[in-house]
Amino acid sequence: MERPLWVRWLKVYAIGGAIIGSGFLLFKYTTPTDQQLISQLSPELRLQYEREKKLRQSEQQALMKIVKETSQSDDPIWKTGPLQSPWERNGDNVQSRDHFAKVRAEEVQKEELARIRNELSQLRSETEEKTKEIVQDKQVKSWWRFW
């Protein structure tokens, strides 16, 4: 004897719900959080991430400013205004990318220069101390003094 149609549909919905629910639970409990991902990065990549964090935030703020300006205008949605469409072949979009790349490169250069300056000042202070020690030793132990 065949089961009623509603029993078969109930079985389909129950199995489908179980598949979807188990997929959701697997996704929720197996995907790492942002902090876990950052903590697992190598120290160099973590440092680079922290350095470029402000740049990404400023880039996002600039994008949100453009989106707000575009949403307040009466122009149709396909007229993006200062925000260039990725399908257009203008060089304006490339210029904004270049601008952010230049800003990023300048920040990296400034940090590198600061690090080099710190190392240089440490070396100068160390050599200055050693030079003073050598001069004091020479004054105390002069080869031409007999007394």
Swiss-Prot record:
Write down the InterPro entries for this protein, in alphabetical order. Answer: Cbp4
Q: Name one GO biological process term.
A: mitochondrial respiratory chain complex III assembly
Record-level GO cellular component terms:
mitochondrial inner membrane; mitochondrial membrane; mitochondrion
Q: Where is this protein found? A: Mitochondrion inner membrane
Report TM segments.
5-27
Keyword list (alphabetical) reads: Chaperone, Membrane, Mitochondrion, Mitochondrion inner membrane, Transmembrane, Transmembrane helix
Q: How does it sit in the membrane?
A: Single-pass membrane protein
Residue ranges of the region described as Disordered: 73-94
**Keyword Mitochondrion on this protein?**
yes
Keyword Transferase appears in the UniProt entry = no
Q: What does this chain do? A: Essential for the assembly of ubiquinol-cytochrome c reductase. It has a direct effect on the correct occurrence of the Rieske protein, core 4, core 5 and apocytochrome b.
Q: Which family does it belong to?
A: Belongs to the CBP4 family.
A further note on this protein reads: Present with 704 molecules/cell in log phase SD medium.
Know the name of this protein? Assembly factor CBP4
Query: Gene encoding it?
Result: CBP4
